[in-house]
Amino acid sequence: MKPKQKISVEPLLLVAILIGVLVAATHAQDQKSVKPSAAAPSAAASRPHDEIYIDDDSIEGSGGRGGIHEDLEKDPDYSGSGFGPDDEDAEPDQHSHSSHNTRISQSSNSGINTAHTPTQTSSTIPTTSTSTPMPTTTPTATTPASTTTAAATQISSFANSSSTTTTTLAPTIPAEPQQPLFPPFDKDLDTESSGDGIDADAEDDDEDDGDDKDYDYNKELDKEIDIDGPEPGHLPPVVHHNTVETGHIPTTDEIDVDGGDEDDNGDSDIDGPRIGGNDGDITERGPGAGGSNVHELDPNTNVNSQPSDTKGIDHRPNGNEVVIMSEDDRTSSFFSQPGILAAVIGGAVVGLLCAILVVMFIVYRMRKKDEGSYALDEPKRSPANNSYAKNANNREFYA
């Protein structure tokens, strides 16, 4: 009876295998029909991101961010050092800056407060540091003092000219570029402001004796400034910045409208580059240090590059999103290809068949072990009968 039951179970297993194969095939066909439809909107959704990203690049190339970089490339590195071209040659390059570029350059040069002085102030201030007379009695002691007084008169004249012009500009209301206002030349103001700088420098050099001599030299310098005309070949290094900031209103807190504060700033500028200045203070940048003016342009270029960098950072996530969408498209297109999909379905079907065959073989071995290895037709012998027969045949047991 048991072999008949075994034969009746095998057709049922085969039918179950066929049903499983049909179910797997239909499920694979459903996946094949669903995945291309799911891949279509993902591809359609990725296209607008790509188009938007391309549009942003085109907008940036049209003058949003590229214009600033082009202006920075045109900006000479030697501006403000005194070794570059004249103001007339540098005006087209300097006027091409944006508004925030001019504000930052004003904050960097606000120690002298000549950021928004008119361009024609250079005509009244020639460089006469080399034309100062030196006495014959003490040439070694008065030579540095004479050069410092020349620089002091230059800076004081800068401070006075800037103090008169800054009062005409309102700090909050934007104004149009005004005509240059030439301040009245006052010798008393120049000597007072330059005298303060002489006192600061004389403490390091000649104490009180050098102050009187420098004061006399100061008057002679004022006379020379009245007589001499503008020297176009030798312009002050600070006036080179004036072509940028004409007509712009300062927005930083460092630039003051009061004239007294500007005179103090001018005096502190005299002390800064010679004594050593404070840490990170504006007084470190004096008019005589040409190299420091070159370094002043570095923060401007860095700050101007910051909006462009932030724009690039804003667009980088968009680029990453495009890459993520392309990965989704890649996975969807991977299963949407007919050859790859057929291979996956075939592998799944073969795996199911192998699993079913293994289960059937295990079940067959378990049933064969339960039946036993003995023959079903042979009668079983009891151990009692065998022992009795052996005892009957054994005669030595009775002896």
From Swiss-Prot:
Main location: membrane
Residue span of region Disordered: 28-319, 373-399
Cytoplasmic-side positions: 366-399
Tissue distribution: In 13-16 hours embryos, expressed in lymph glands, peripheral and central nervous system and basal surfaces of gut epithelia. Sdc and robo are coexpressed in domains adjacent to slit; in tracheal pits and midline glia cells.
Stretches with biased composition (Polar residues): 99-116, 299-309, 383-399
Annotated protein name in UniProt: Syndecan
Bilayer topology: Single-pass type I membrane protein
Comp. bias (Acidic residues): 191-214, 253-270
Spans through the membrane: 341-365
One Gene Ontology term from the biological process aspect of the record: axon guidance
Subcellular location: Membrane
Low complexity biased stretches: 36-46, 117-172
Compositionally biased tracts (Basic and acidic residues): 67-77, 215-226
Residue intervals annotated with topology Extracellular: 29-340
Role summary: Cell surface proteoglycan that bears heparan sulfate. Required for axonal and myotube guidance, is a necessary component of slit/robo signaling and is required in the slit target cells.
Signal peptide annotation: 1-28
Record-stated family: Belongs to the syndecan proteoglycan family.
Top-level taxonomic group: Eukaryota
Disrupted gene: phenotype observed: Flies exhibit aberrant midline guidance of axons and establishment of muscle pattern.
Gene assigned in the entry: Sdc
Alphabetical UniProt keywords: Developmental protein, Differentiation, Glycoprotein, Heparan sulfate, Membrane, Myogenesis, Neurogenesis, Proteoglycan, Signal, Transmembrane, Transmembrane helix
A Pfam match: Syndecan
Species the sequence originates in: Drosophila melanogaster (Fruit fly)
Glycosylation sites per record: S62, S79, S81, S110, N160, S194
Coiled coil: none
CC annotations in GO: axon; cell surface; membrane; neuromuscular junction; perivitelline space; synapse
